Amino acid sequence: MSLVCSVIFIHHAFNANILDKDYAFSDGEILMVDNAVRTHFEPYERHFKEIGFNENTIKKYLQCTNIQTVTVPVPAKFLRASNVPTGLLNEMIAYLNSEERNHHNFSELLLFSCLSIFAACKGFITLLTNGVLSVSGKVRNIVNMKLAHPWKLKDICDCLYISESLLKKKLKQEQTTFSQILLDARMQHAKNLIRVEGSVNKIAEQCGYASTSYFIYAFRKHFGNSPKRVSKEYRCQRHTGMNTGNTMSALAI
């Protein structure tokens, strides 16, 4: 799968010309680099270690976080951060690049931690979303950052620096629409919340619905069952699983 960006940990200072501009990079500095300009750093690879991030990792990170979207006039091609515990970061990157990386959940948390170093940087979200390969993917990632927000087509266009007519055209080429992407994202989030949240009112609110009754209508139309029915099915599945586990334990004794 294609890389979206890389996090680079500089262990030896160097000077470089990136995109026709001279830069001085310091020992211990951390960079997030758009994959489109990654080749500009290749001549200096002996000065740094890095970890790459593919589209799936970026999508999941954006879904799991709640970072506000901030538009910037010109999308950054790389971001810089400092005052990071370099010893810890060095060990994290070494582990993520090693063959010992066999604990998926732990590795994923480390990857998310590397990305979060840049969360306060202006242009962070723009860099990530611009790296997602499809237009529908970019829209989905923006929506997933805050599903409770009353998203409008104009909001998405502002984030992507694109006109409403052009965005509609591009989404049509990918056989989808903004409304469909928003609905799918909210319904999937609702289905996940039902596993842990008992209040339909709260779920509706967290998914961006001002009206609980309309949320229930939309959920039933999307999944064929009401939220309460799906919640009950999940509880039954958990109960059955627990009983099976207890039976197996008793047999083992």
From Swiss-Prot:
Which PROSITE patterns does its entry note?
A: HTH_ARAC_FAMILY_1, HTH_ARAC_FAMILY_2
What top-level branch of life does the organism fall under? Bacteria
Q: What induces it?
A: Induced by EvgA.
DNA-binding region positions on the chain: 154-175, 200-223
Keywords from the UniProt entry = Activator, DNA-binding, Transcription, Transcription regulation
Q: Does the keyword Glycoprotein apply?
A: no
Keyword Nucleotide-binding belongs to the record: no
The record ties this protein, via Pfam families, to: HTH_18
One Gene Ontology molecular-function label: sequence-specific DNA binding
- Could you tell me which residue ranges the HTH araC/xylS-type domain spans? 137-233
General function of this protein:
Induces the expression of gadE. Could also regulate the expression of other genes involved in acid resistance.
Q: What is this protein called?
A: HTH-type transcriptional regulator YdeO
